[in-house]
Structure formats: structure tokens, C-alpha cells
């Protein structure tokens, strides 16, 4: 029973924490995307975003912007080197794309943190409760055998323990599986926002490189 109580309390703590975290992340992402498309200078937006924490799209933007700045600095130092212009442009865009993908994967992994605990709770606690149920019934039969009678006073404690274990298992599993599916959907929405932003930012970088 203590194991089921632990899983129940821990899963509720995770549910509350992830609900707040994902809600804040979604609101922050929407605000930044609006600011991004309204911004006239990306360097100013980058400076403003440097102090922002807990926003996955900002982290992806910052990683891509830093890599783009690095590519431009390298190109400015190597202006005397003869090379294929198209090859240089593609190399720069690919470097920015790799930086964006790394940052996006890292942020998505952060969003998925502790979600697997809810899946574990949802799948394991019914079986733990079932084990408690079987154990309680076994105790009831043991009491019947030891006392040679099958009265209510003999079987009631074991049956009660069995039903409590079943109820605790379901009480832990049901909220966990509902929350898991809900959070997976929210993470999918945020992942789509990150992927769309990555593609849009990469297009902007590509056009900027080609215009130079």
C-alpha cells in the first residue's frame, strides 16, 4: 500500500509541475513568435531574449543566431580566399541548421522530462494493486484455514485489504494516464511550433546569406 501511495503522491506532484511548466512554455513561445515577426532587427531581439529563461523557442533562436553570427564572422575573415560562392552559402546554412536541430532536440527532451514517470505509474500501479488484491484474498483463505470457519469476521479483513489495494492502484493509474496523454499532446504542439520556427528562421538565414 505504501508503494501505491508513493506513486500516487509523486505522480500528482509531477502532474502539477508539468502542467505549470508546459502552460508557461506555450504562453512564452506564443509571445516570442509574435515579437519575432514584428522585430525589425534580430540583433536587438537576441539581446532582449538573452535574459529570458524557460522558453524553448527562444533557446532555439539563440542557438541559430549565434551560429549565423559565427558563420558571418568566419566569412568576413576569409574574404581573400577563393572558393565557390554557392558552396560557401550552403555550408553556412547547413551549419545554422545543425545548430537549430541540436537546440530543438535538447529543448524537446527537456519538455519530455518526467513524462515517462507518468507512463510508468499508469502501467505499473494497476498490477501492484492487483498483487495486493491477490495477497489480501490469500490472507482471507489462510484465516479460513487456520480458524476452520468462513464467517464474515474471518474473511472481511483480507477482502477489505484486497479492495483497498485495487482502489489505490486505480486511483494512481487513472490520473497518470489522463495527464500523460494530455501532456503528450501539449508537447506535440510545442514541438510543432519549434519545428516551424526552425524552418522559418533557416529560410531567413538562407535569404540573408544569398543576398550578401
Where are the model-predicted features located?
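Hydrophobic membrane-targeting segments
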Residues: 1-34
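Generic short alpha-helical hydrophobic face used as a protein-protein interaction/packing hotspot
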Residues: 16, 49-50, 163
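Bilayer-spanning, highly hydrophobic alpha-helical transmembrane segments
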Residues: 4-8, 113-143, 160-182
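Hydrophobic alpha-helical transmembrane segments and adjacent short intramembrane/lumenal linkers
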Residues: 148-162
Amino acid at each position: 500500500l505504501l508503494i501505491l501511495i508513493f506513486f500516487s503522491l509523486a505522480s500528482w506532484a509531477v502532474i502539477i509541475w508539468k502542467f505549470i511548466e508546459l502552460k508557461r512554455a506555450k504562453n512564452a513561445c506564443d509571445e516570442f513568435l509574435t515579437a519575432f515577426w514584428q522585430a525589425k532587427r534580430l540583433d536587438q531581439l537576441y539581446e532582449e531574449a538573452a535574459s529570458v529563461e524557460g522558453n524553448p523557442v527562444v533557446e532555439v533562436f539563440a542557438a541559430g543566431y549565434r551560429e549565423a553570427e559565427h558563420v558571418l564572422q568566419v566569412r568576413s575573415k576569409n574574404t581573400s580566399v577563393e572558393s565557390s560562392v554557392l558552396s560557401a552559402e550552403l555550408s553556412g546554412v547547413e551549419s545554422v541548421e545543425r545548430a537549430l536541430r541540436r537546440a530543438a532536440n535538447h529543448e524537446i527532451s527537456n519538455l519530455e522530462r518526467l513524462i515517462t514517470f507518468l507512463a510508468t505509474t499508469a502501467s505499473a500501479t494497476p498490477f501492484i494493486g492487483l498483487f495486493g488484491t491477490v495477497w489480501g484474498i490469500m490472507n482471507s483463505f489462510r484465516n479460513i484455514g487456520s480458524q476452520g470457519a468462513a464467517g464474515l469476521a474471518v474473511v472481511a479483513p483480507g477482502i477489505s485489504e484486497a479492495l483497498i489495494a485495487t482502489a489505490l492502484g486505480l486511483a494512481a493509474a487513472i490520473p497518470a494516464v489522463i495527464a500523460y496523454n494530455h501532456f503528450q499532446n501539449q508537447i506535440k504542439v510545442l514541438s510543432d511550433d519549434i519545428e516551424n520556427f526552425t524552418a522559418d528562421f533557416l529560410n531567413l538565414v538562407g535569404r540573408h546569406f544569398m543576398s550578401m
